[in-house]
Amino acid sequence: MKKILMLSGPDNRKGYIEDVKELINKNLSGKRSIICISANPDKYEKNDKQVYGKDDSLGIIKMLGMCWVKIENTYLIDNRNIKEFDKNLFLDVDIIYFMGGDPLLQNQFVIDNNLLEYIKMSDAFIIGVSAGSMNLAENTFIPKYELNDKARFIKGFGLCNYSIVPHYDINDLMQVNEVKENCCEHNLIGLPNESAIYINGDIVEFVNDYYLYNSK
């Protein structure tokens, strides 16, 4: 059974919250290898910053290092290298990291390049952040601000059954109303930035606050 960690928006300057650090350390401490899947496949400089850090941004590798995870081999895939990328590496790495950014671009990137078959065969620990967490669901909810027309569901990667709304703010009435208006077809979970969902087979652990909106 896959182990999945769904994150909303970790602080790029401070790293993961303590509870999330403990979860990552418990599952991944030691020397590891990682594949990072871009959610902005054409924005190479942005992708490099997300993974390796720059200026005031720690980057994924340093943030994992703060959890006592030493990344020895890093594979960042975007449109620079996807044509030459060896998909069998998905079967060998310890971590598959779905990066934050544009959920629609990431969804299309994974599907168009036939990555999902290999991801589903992999035993790697899966981490999703923001857009990456959104796409892990069977049904991915895309808010209006991502589309500039209206909110909708698209087919996700089917790695879990939790459709999340990242960066959720219960005091943002526009966001709350949008979720309420769109939870008729599928359940939705509003996940604030300091929250997470950890899935280990049939065991599900929620870290900090979350807001469940049931379909009718």
Segments and roles (model prediction):
Residues M1-G30, S38-V51, D55, T140-K216:
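C-terminal and late-domain segments of enzyme folds
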Residues Y44-P103:
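A glycine-rich, hydrophobic loop/mini-helix early in the fold
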Residues L23, D112-A124:
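Catalytic-core regions built around general acid/base machinery
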Residues Y97-M99, M121-N139:
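Catalytic nucleophile loop
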Residues P103-I111:
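Glycine/threonine-rich flexible loop motifs
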Residues I34, I96, S130, I164, ...:
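A residue-level signal for conserved active-site and pocket-lining positions in enzyme catalytic cores
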Residues K31, D92-V93, S122-D123, C160:
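Short, well-ordered alpha-helix to beta-strand connector turns
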